[in-house]
Amino acid sequence: SNKKDYRKEIVDKHNALSRSVKPTASNM
C-alpha cells in the first residue's frame, strides 16, 4: 500500500511536469 501511494505521488508530479511542457509530453 505504501508503494502504491509513493507511485501515485510520482505520477502526479510527472503529470504536473508534463502539463508544464506540453511539447515534450507528446514525445513520451
Curated annotation (Swiss-Prot):
Coiled coil: none annotated. Keywords: Calcium channel impairing toxin, Disulfide bond, Ion channel impairing toxin, Neurotoxin, Secreted, Toxin. The keyword Manganese does not apply. One of its GO terms (molecular function) is calcium channel regulator activity. Contains 8 disulfide bonds. Its main location: secreted. Residues 17-28 have a biased composition (Polar residues). It is found in: Secreted. Residues 1-28 are annotated as: Disordered. Residues 1-15 have a biased composition (Basic and acidic residues). Expressed by the venom gland. GO terms for cellular component: extracellular region. Belongs to the CRISP family. Blocks contraction of smooth muscle elicited by high potassium-induced depolarization, but does not block caffeine-stimulated contraction. May target voltage-gated calcium channels on smooth muscle. This is Cysteine-rich venom protein asurin-2.
